């Protein structure tokens, strides 16, 4: 895969993106090209370069040296562009059907040129609109299972795994997660962002020593358990989808982390969407949670039995222990994500987009209670069906 020679970093423009596409020969000579900046995230510029005749295009993504959501006062490493392109290539070696093709990367300019997925829709947007994406959980479960297994000590030579893990050391972006997911929402921190009407609920979390202990345990797992190469930010805004197709994007937070983290992030964002819906429209979200875990555990178990390089692989109870801890960790991580997406720095449109103010505030109160329950009760849950029950109990208790 071509990688450029060192150059001096400068932010890309629409004309610059067109010039790059021409230089790389990604379109036939003389093709009339148009370009538009389409990024709506916090950390990058994203350009779509399109053949005006065929409407076929490419995506040019460039990391910014700061977070757009804050500005230049929050500097960020450009190395994350290398992390992202390398993660996409690594994932593609196991599940090419679930990630965009990478055509080119430039380390100095922090640029990745990749497949255009504009025929698909960001899953969060579609779910908010009421779409169900029937294959979403099948695909996400398989993606997490295969990438987790094959990049772990069970799926590859342990020494090779250590070398691969070294290439994905990602301290700056891991710190964002450590702060925004596992720390700041649980304290009176300046990055938090919530409505005044929620202050009593939020201060209750800040003063909850039992919750703090469990959140600290989950943070420690994130800090210390390097099970496999994980996406690191697998929410529904990092997924393109249709009824037939799923593509995972934006793995710039990728690093060697706990098996359960990506699952927990995905669960949390499905639960947040469920909280935004009337009860009679929540079933597809719970079905996706069920299916994700079913597929993950089945595929991971099949790979364990057929491709495991660990001498202890056939030891009775080891697979079950790995899956058990992955599940309860995922539940806890989901709880942290639900809380942070409600009162932390980066919210989700699922809740913030609820038009009626009282309904929006109520949904956020439910989210805080649900997040707390997921964290505190994670070790008592043994199946995804029990997540449904916990969800119902949280909402029911809040209405009584």
UniProtKB/Swiss-Prot annotation:
Q: What sort of enzyme, by top EC class, is this?
A: transferase
Query: SUPFAM superfamilies in the record, alphabetically?
Result: Protein kinase-like (PK-like)
Matching Pfam families: APH
Q: What does this protein do?
A: Catalyzes the phosphorylation of methylthioribose into methylthioribose-1-phosphate.
Q: Which reaction does it catalyse?
A: 5-(methylsulfanyl)-D-ribose + ATP = 5-(methylsulfanyl)-alpha-D-ribose 1-phosphate + ADP + H(+)
Provide the binding site for ATP.
44, 61, 115-117, 250-252
Subunit structure and binding partners: Homodimer.
Q: What is this protein called?
A: Methylthioribose kinase
Cite the annotated pathway.
Amino-acid biosynthesis; L-methionine biosynthesis via salvage pathway; S-methyl-5-thio-alpha-D-ribose 1-phosphate from S-methyl-5'-thioadenosine (hydrolase route): step 2/2
Organism, as annotated: Geobacillus sp. (strain WCH70)
Q: Which InterPro entries match?
A: Aminoglycoside_PTrfase (IPR002575), Kinase-like_dom_sf (IPR011009), Methylthioribose_kinase (IPR009212)
Say yes or no: keyword Transferase present. Answer: yes
In this UniProt entry, which cysteines form S-S bonds? none
Q: Which residues bind substrate?
A: 233, 340
- Single annotated GO MF: S-methyl-5-thioribose kinase activity
